[in-house]
Amino acid sequence: MTTQVSFATRVGRSVLAALGAVSLSAAVLTAPAHAADTGLFGTQDATYDGVYRQSLAIAGLAATDARIPAAAVDWLADQQCADGSFEAFRSNTSSPCSPSDPENFSGPDTNSTAMAAIALYLAGRTAPARDAIVWLNNVQNDDWGFPFYAGGASDANSTGLSVVAIQTVQPQDKSGRVPNAQAWIGGLKLKCLSGGGLAYQKGGPANGLASSQAYMGLSGALPVDPVDTLSPNPDCKKRNAVSNVGSFLASAITKDGAVQSDFGSGADYSSTGWAVLGLVANGVGKGAVKSGVSTLTRDVESYTYSDGDLVPAAAGLLLMVAAATDEDPRSFGGINLKRALIGSMQ
C-alpha cells in the first residue's frame, strides 16, 4: 500500500527545498553549516536541502560552462548511499543510510536523488550518476509515477524531476519508463476550461510548482539550450499535456510576471524559473519567457539572498535560466551569479 500526503503536508514537513521552493524556505534555513561541510555551497543549515541545493548549484555552473570546484562535486558524491540513492543530507556519511520512510519523511528521496544524478552527470561523474538512476528506476511505482519517498504515492514534482534525470543521464533509455511516466503526468492535467495545469496528485487543484517541475519532465533534459526564436504562448489543448501545462504556465507568467505561490504569498520565483526552462525547451512562450526573465532579473537579489547570505539553489536555478535565455550570468539583474555561487562555498 502506498502512502499519500497532500502538497501542503509535504511542504509543512520541512521539505520545501526538496520541492525547489527555495524562495519560501530560505528564511528558515539559517543555522550555520556543519564544520565538516567542505565543498558545500551556502552557509545555511543543510539538514533539509543540502543535496538538492548542491545539485542545483552544480547544474547551474555546468549550464553556463563555468569551472565546477572539485570539492563541491566531492561533497555531493560523498553524500550518496550505498544503493545509489541520496537523502536530503547526511551529517555522518560513515553511517549507512536509513530506509526510505514516506510516513516520517526520512531516508532517501527521489527529488534529492534525481537532482544529484543530473549534477554528477554534468560534472563528469557518470558512474555515481547512473547508480542514482538505477535506484530511481527501482522505486518507480506500478502506476508509472514516482513517489517522493519509496513506497509513497506518486506525485507530479517527483515524477517530473525523476524523468528529467533519466533523460539527462540516460537519453538512450528504451525501457518505456520515460513515456509511461510522462503519460502518468498527463493524467494529472486539468480541463482547459478551468485554465489547465497540473495537480500535485490526482484530484487536486492546479498547482504552480507541480506544473512547472512536471512540465520540465515533459520537455526533456537539463541543461536547456537557447533557441533562436520562440513561438508565441501555447494554446491549451485538452488532449495534449504539453500544450495544456505550457499554456497554464505561460498565461500565469504573462498575467502576473511570475507563477504565483500556491500559498498566496506573491510570486514564486522557483516555479517561474522552472516554467521558463520548460517553455524554452519546447520552443514556445515568447511573451511569457520575456516577462518571466524580466521578473527574475528585477527581483534577483530578494530571491538569491536571505539575510545577506546567498541561497545556492536559487543561484543555480537562475544560472540555468540565464543559459537557456542567453542572459549574462555574470550580470543577471546586476549580480554575478557565478562569482556569488563560488564565493559561497564552504
Which residues fall in each region the model found?
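Preference for long, amphipathic alpha-helical scaffolds in soluble/luminal domains
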Residues: T2-Q346
